[in-house]
From Swiss-Prot:
InterPro entries: GHMP_kinase_C_dom, GHMP_kinase_C_sf, GHMP_kinase_N_dom, IspE, Ribosomal_Su5_D2-typ_SF, Ribsml_uS5_D2-typ_fold_subgr. One of its GO terms (molecular function) is ATP binding. It is an enzyme of class 2 (transferase). The active site is at K9, D135. PANTHER family: 4-DIPHOSPHOCYTIDYL-2-C-METHYL-D-ERYTHRITOL KINASE, CHLOROPLASTIC. Keywords: ATP-binding, Kinase, Nucleotide-binding, Transferase. This is Putative 4-diphosphocytidyl-2-C-methyl-D-erythritol kinase. It comes from Staphylococcus saprophyticus subsp. saprophyticus (strain ATCC 15305 / DSM 20229 / NCIMB 8711 / NCTC 7292 / S-41). It catalyses: 4-CDP-2-C-methyl-D-erythritol + ATP = 4-CDP-2-C-methyl-D-erythritol 2-phosphate + ADP + H(+). The lineage of its organism: Bacteria, Bacillati, Bacillota, Bacilli, Bacillales.
Length: 282
């Protein structure tokens, strides 16, 4: 049996530059990882089936699950005959803007690479993974990075300074395609990509907090004002910086001290069904 840890990602920045001819948006975003993890195990079967075993009933176990899709893609690409069972211990909130599905798919590709002794380079897996999810290449590598294109052009950056992260997901679901459809690229909105990159290079925590920005936040916030209320609540209760991750609805806050993070946690815990205190990984 093979084990893999699948950490959640957060966006330090997210900018959308223009709509591409292939229907996707050209993005420029800085992402890092946090120690909120799913845990996956992989075991060979005697038949050819892919079986996904996940305890939570709201998580699909068929080909709607990105881990299942990743396993299908790996089997087809590398002509793998023997089936496998994928067991997922799910801790990352779903449909949250934290790449919970993508990180499971990435862990599946890494896990199968070891389980079947394929020894393929991770960069090769990234090129495969982009076929089923734009966050998957980042999740396969799992390091702080500037991602461009659809998300497949990856430039490694320095790890962020050490900090606590309070992650809060309100009780609502958001469809990423719906958010991108409602995005008006003619509306002015500043995303501080370069400032964030410089903050990572210099290890400047205060500048990092000031640079947190997301082009999709006003769009998701207009549809669901809970998002902006949570962000305001975090900042009012001592967050050094706060921003929505991905297309939402999750908002996170950065804090230098654990006591500070606990205070923010207590402030938002009553209005969110899922709140976690974790650490930046990067």
């Amino acid at each position: 049996m093979i084990y893999e840890t699948a950490p959640a990602k957060i966006n330090l920045t997210l900018d959308t530059l223009f709509k591409r001819d292939d229907g996707f948006h050209e993005v420029e975003m800085i992402m890092t990882t946090i120690d909120l993890n799913d845990r996956l195990s992989f075991e060979l079967r005697k038949d050819k089936k892919i079986v996904v075993d996940v305890e939570q009933t709201y998580v699909p176990s068929d080909n709607k699950n990105l881990a299942y899709k990743a396993a299908e893609l790996m089997k087809k690409t590398y002509n793998l005959q023997q089936g496998l069972t994928i067991t997922i211990d799910k801790n990352i909130p779903v449909s949250a803007g934290l790449a919970g599905g993508s990180t499971d798919a990435a862990a599946t590709m890494r896990g199968m690479n070891r389980l079947y002794k394929l020894n393929r380079p991770l960069e090769e897996l990234c090129a495969l993974g982009i076929q089923i999810g734009t966050d998957i290449p980042f999740c396969i590598l799992g390091k702080t990075a500037l991602c461009k294109g659809k998300g497949e052009i990856i430039e490694y950056l320095d790890k962020p300074p050490s900090a606590w992260v309070v992650v809060a997901k309100p009780d609502l679901g958001i469809s990423s395609p719906d958010i991108f459809k409602k995005l008006d690229l003619t509306q002015p909105h500043t995303v501080h990509t370069e400032a964030c990159e410089n903050a990572l290079i210099s290890g400047d925590y205060e500048q990092l907090c000031k640079s947190l920005s997301n082009r999709l936040e006003p769009v998701s916030g207009k549809m669901h004002d809970e998002i902006l209320k949570i962000k305001a609540n975090m900042l009012e209760n001592g967050a050094d910086g706060a921003v929505m991750s991905g297309s939402g609805p999750t908002v996170y806050a950065l804090a230098r001290k654990e006591r500070q993070a606990r205070h923010i946690y207590n402030a938002v815990n009553g209005c969110c069904n899922e709140v976690h205190i974790v650490r930046l990984l990067g």
